[in-house]
């Protein structure tokens, strides 16, 4: 029988991603208020935090509650957090417009993460 338990690094990375979602949410609300308001990017930051935290929860589910750890689902979800949320965070603070095309790639990665769960077989 194949061992489908998540690797230790995946559990640790999930914890770090979740913690950073909370940290960045608090930082946006309390440390970057003026910058985000000046740039008119409060909603961009809030969108990044929302998707970051939703997908941190998905990573917890993937690593702890599924009967079969899906490396592909985990990979797509993690890539989505970094590309989608990361590009929005940077866009909100620095207004780097060239990051705009990266955001949808992260969004597609999120979609693929959810769709790859269709392949997970229950035992």
Regions found by a protein language model. Name each.
Residues 1-123:
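Polytopic transmembrane helical bundles with strong interfacial aromatic enrichment
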């Amino acid at each position: 029988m194949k061992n489908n338990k998540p690797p230790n690094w995946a559990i640790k990375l999930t914890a770090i991603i979740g913690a950073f979602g909370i940290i960045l949410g608090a930082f946006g609300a309390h440390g970057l208020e003026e910058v985000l308001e000046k740039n008119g990017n409060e909603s961009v930051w809030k969108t990044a935090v929302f998707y970051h935290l939703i997908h941190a929860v998905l990573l917890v589910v993937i690593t702890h509650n599924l009967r079969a750890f899906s490396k592909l689902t985990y990979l797509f979800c993690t890539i989505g957090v970094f590309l989608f949320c990361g590009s929005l965070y940077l866009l909100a603070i620095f207004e780097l417009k060239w990051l705009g095309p990266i955001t949808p790639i992260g969004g597609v990665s999120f979609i693929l993460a959810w769709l790859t769960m269709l392949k997970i077989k229950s035992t």
